[in-house]
Amino acid sequence: MQPDPRPSGAGACCRFLPLQSQCPEGAGDAVMYASTECKAEVTPSQHGNRTFSYTLEDHTKQAFGIMNELRLSQQLCDVTLQVKYQDAPAAQFMAHKVVLASSSPVFKAMFTNGLREQGMEVVSIEGIHPKVMERLIEFAYTASISMGEKCVLHVMNGAVMYQIDSVVRACSDFLVQQLDPSNAIGIANFAEQIGCVELHQRAREYIYMHFGEVAKQEEFFNLSHCQLVTLISRDDLNVRCESEVFHACINWVKYDCEQRRFYVQALLRAVRCHSLTPNFLQMQLQKCEILQSDSRCKDYLVKIFEELTLHKPTQVMPCRAPKVGRLIYTAGGYFRQSLSYLEAYNPSDGTWLRLADLQVPRSGLAGCVVGGLLYAVGGRNNSPDGNTDSSALDCYNPMTNQWSPCAPMSVPRNRIGVGVIDGHIYAVGGSHGCIHHNSVERYEPERDEWHLVAPMLTRRIGVGVAVLNRLLYAVGGFDGTNRLNSAECYYPERNEWRMITAMNTIRSGAGVCVLHNCIYAAGGYDGQDQLNSVERYDVETETWTFVAPMKHRRSALGITVHQGRIYVLGGYDGHTFLDSVECYDPDTDTWSEVTRMTSGRSGVGVAVTMEPCRKQIDQQNCTC
C-alpha cells in the first residue's frame, strides 16, 4: 500500500503499515501475539496540538473493591497478620501489604524500610485487640468503618497506634458529640494518654464550661489532688460564684476524708477565696467539719475574712474569665421618650443583638449583674401620656431571653446609681418627682427582699456608683440645688458613709466604673456644659488625676468595663442624643470610637454578662 499524498487537515486519513512480527522462528503463537508491534500512523488534524485524556471516576473504588474481594477469598494475599492481645484468642488476618501500607504509615514503614517484616509472610502483632485490627483492615480496603459506642475508644487507640489519622479524627468528632458531665473527665484523660491534642482540648473546655455539673459526677471524685488543683486554678472556669469551687473541693475531700484531708490547704490556695463573701467564709469557719480539724486552713481563711472586712487592697488571683461570650448589654434609655430596648454589643465581632424588650419603657435606670443575671433598676417612664418614676426591679435571664419582675424598691428612683457587694444590689439616691434621695437600700436576690441601709451624707441624683474592695462609692450628682464634685464611701460592716477626696471637676450624670483598682469618672454635666474630661481616683493615694479625655462630650452616658477596657455608650452632648461608643485603653491612655449604637439615646442601663442563648433570639447584624 502506497502512502496517501494528500496534506494533513480536514478529512486527513490514517496510514496503516503492515504488521511485521519480530518473533524468532518457532517461538509460538502466544509469544508472537504478545510481541506484535503496531505501526499504524495517524495524520494529525489541522490543529495538531490537541490532547486527549480520560478519567474513570470510580476506578479507585472499583479497584479496592476487587482487592477486598481477593482478601476475603484469600487470593493474591502476601501477608498474614497474627494478632495477639492479652488473654483474647489470637486471630489471623490475610491481607495485601500494598493496601495496608497505603492506609497506615506504620505498615508502610514495616513493609518498605528494610525491616525484618518486609520479607515475612506471617507478621506477629501485639498490643491491639483482634476485633480492632479487623476493623482497621476493613477500613484500609473499604474506606468505611462502623462500631458500637463502647468500641470507639479501642478503635481510636488502635488508629493512633497505626497513625490512621482519618479514623482518629472521625472517632474524635464522635466522642466530642458524646461529651456530658458524667464522661468528660474520662474522655479528657483518655485523649491525654493517647496524645490526641484536639480531643483533649475539647474535653477540657467542656469541663471548664460545665464545671458545676461535672463536679457532681463520680469521675470528678476520682481525680487526683494534682489534677483537681490544676483544674480549679484555671482562670476560664465557668462558675456563677466562687462558692461553687469551694464546695466542690470540700466534697472531693469528704469522698475519702482519711486520705485527702492532707490536701485541703493546697486546694484552698487554688480557690479564689478573696472572691468569697465574708458571710460565706464566716459560715464555713463555724460549720465545716474539715476546716475545724485543720488549724492551718482555718487560720488561712480567717486572714482572708479579715482582709475582706477591712477592705484592704490585696494582690490576689484574677477573677475568673470563662471562655463564654460576654457581651455589653444596654437597657432602656431616652430619645424623645423613654425606650424599652434591650440590646447587646459583642466587642469581639462588632455585632449588636436585639433582645426581649423591657416590660415598661424606662430611662434614667441603672443596670447590674448578679450570678449571670441582668437587673434593671429604677428609672422613669417618660411618655406622651405623662412621666412616671419607677421603683421597679426586673431580672433578665440570658438563657431564656426573658424578663421577670422582682420585688420593687421602697421608693421610686429616677437617675439612680447601683453597685453590687457580696451578691447584693445597692440602690443609691435618685429622685421621685421633686424629692432628691439620699436614701440607700439593699436587695437580696435569694430572698427577693429590699432593706434600707444607712443614707448618704448628701442627696444625689445622676450619681455615679462603683464598688472597689467591697466598698460602695457614690460620686458626683445633683442635690437639687448644686451639681457636685463631692464623693463618699459606704462601709457595709459599719453601715456608715464617709466623705472622700472630691473630684477635680463638678459632674452630674457622669459615668463611673472601676478598672485596675482605680475609680474612673467620665463626662457628665457641670451646670454649664457637657464634659468629655475623665479623671481617676487612686484609693491608695486618695487622689484624683486626669487621664485622656473622650472624643465626645457626653452626660447621662452608659459605662462599663469589658476585658480590661472601659466602654462608654450614648449620652447627650448638649445638642444631640449620641449613638457613638468609645473605648478606653489604660495601657496607652487613649480613647477610640469602636462602633455605633442602633440609635442615639441617653440614660441607658449598662452591664456585662454572658452571651444569650442563640436559640431564643434572632440575631441582628448592625453595620456602622
From Swiss-Prot:
* Matches recorded under Gene3D superfamilies: 1.25.40.420, Kelch-type beta propeller (2.120.10.80), Potassium Channel Kv1.1, Chain A (3.30.710.10)
Q: What does the UniProt function comment say about this protein?
A: Substrate-specific adapter of a BCR (BTB-CUL3-RBX1) E3 ubiquitin ligase complex that regulates the response to oxidative stress by targeting NFE2L2/NRF2 for ubiquitination. KEAP1 acts as a key sensor of oxidative and electrophilic stress: in normal conditions, the BCR(KEAP1) complex mediates ubiquitination and degradation of NFE2L2/NRF2, a transcription factor regulating expression of many cytoprotective genes.
Quote the entry's note on domains.
Answer: KEAP1 contains reactive cysteine residues that act as sensors for endogenously produced and exogenously encountered small molecules, which react with sulfhydryl groups and modify the cysteine sensors, leading to impair ability of the BCR(KEAP1) complex to ubiquitinate target proteins. The Kelch repeats mediate interaction with NFE2L2/NRF2, BPTF and PGAM5.
The record's subcellular location field reads: Cytoplasm; Nucleus
Mapped Kelch repeat ranges? 327-372, 373-423, 424-470, 471-517, 518-564, 565-611
S-(2-succinyl)cysteine modifications at: 38, 151, 241, 288, 319, 613
Cellular component terms (Gene Ontology)? actin filament; centriolar satellite; Cul3-RING ubiquitin ligase complex; cytoplasm; cytosol; endoplasmic reticulum; inclusion body; midbody
> Which Gene Ontology BP annotations are present?
cellular response to interleukin-4; cellular response to oxidative stress; in utero embryonic development; negative regulation of response to oxidative stress; negative regulation of transcription by RNA polymerase II; positive regulation of proteasomal ubiquitin-dependent protein catabolic process; proteasome-mediated ubiquitin-dependent protein catabolic process; protein ubiquitination
The reply on keyword Nucleus is: yes
Give the family per the record.
Belongs to the KEAP1 family.
Q: Which organism is it from?
A: Homo sapiens (Human)
Q: What is the effect of changing residue 284 to L?
A: In a lung adenocarcinoma patient
Supply the InterPro entries for this chain. BACK (IPR011705), BTB-kelch_protein (IPR017096), BTB/POZ_dom (IPR000210), KEAP1_BACK (IPR047098), KEAP1_BTB_POZ_dom (IPR030563), Kelch-typ_b-propeller (IPR015915), Kelch_1 (IPR006652), SKP1/BTB/POZ_sf (IPR011333)
**Residues where S-cGMP-cysteine is found:** 434
What the record says about activity regulation is: Ubiquitin ligase activity of the BCR(KEAP1) complex is inhibited by oxidative stress and electrophile metabolites such as sulforaphane. Electrophile metabolites react with reactive cysteine residues in KEAP1 and trigger non-enzymatic covalent modifications of these cysteine residues, leading to inactivate the ubiquitin ligase activity of the BCR(KEAP1) complex. Selective autophagy also inactivates the BCR(KEAP1) complex via interaction between KEAP1 and SQSTM1/p62, which sequesters the complex in inclusion bodies and promotes its degradation.
Q: Domain BTB spans what residues? A: 77-149
Q: Site (Sensor for electrophilic agents): give the residues.
A: 151, 257, 273, 288, 434
Pathways per UniProt: Protein modification; protein ubiquitination
Q: Give the Gene Ontology MF terms in alphabetical order.
A: disordered domain specific binding; identical protein binding; RNA polymerase II-specific DNA-binding transcription factor binding; transcription regulator inhibitor activity; ubiquitin-like ligase-substrate adaptor activity
Q: Give a brief account of the tissues where this protein occurs.
A: Broadly expressed, with highest levels in skeletal muscle.
**What is said about its interaction partners and assembly?**
Component of the BCR(KEAP1) E3 ubiquitin ligase complex, at least composed of 2 molecules of CUL3, 2 molecules of KEAP1, and RBX1. Interacts with NFE2L2/NRF2; the interaction is direct. Forms a ternary complex with NFE2L2/NRF2 and PGAM5. Interacts with (phosphorylated) SQSTM1/p62; the interaction is direct and inactivates the BCR(KEAP1) complex by sequestering it in inclusion bodies, promoting its degradation. Interacts with NFE2L1. Interacts with BPTF and PTMA. Interacts with MAP1LC3B. Interacts indirectly with ENC1. Interacts with SESN1 and SESN2. Interacts with HSP90AA1 and HSP90AB1. (Microbial infection) Interacts with ebolavirus protein VP24; this interaction activates transcription factor NFE2L2/NRF2 by blocking its interaction with KEAP1.
Note the position of the cross-link N5-[4-(S-L-cysteinyl)-5-methyl-1H-imidazol-2-yl]-L-ornithine (Cys-Arg) (interchain with R-135 in KEAP1).
151
Q: What is the name of the protein in this document?
A: Kelch-like ECH-associated protein 1
Q: What CDD domains does the record point to?
A: BACK_KLHL19_KEAP1 (cd18458), BTB_POZ_KLHL19_KEAP1 (cd18248)
Which keywords are on file for this protein?
A: Cytoplasm, Host-virus interaction, Kelch repeat, Nucleus, Repeat, S-nitrosylation, Ubl conjugation, Ubl conjugation pathway
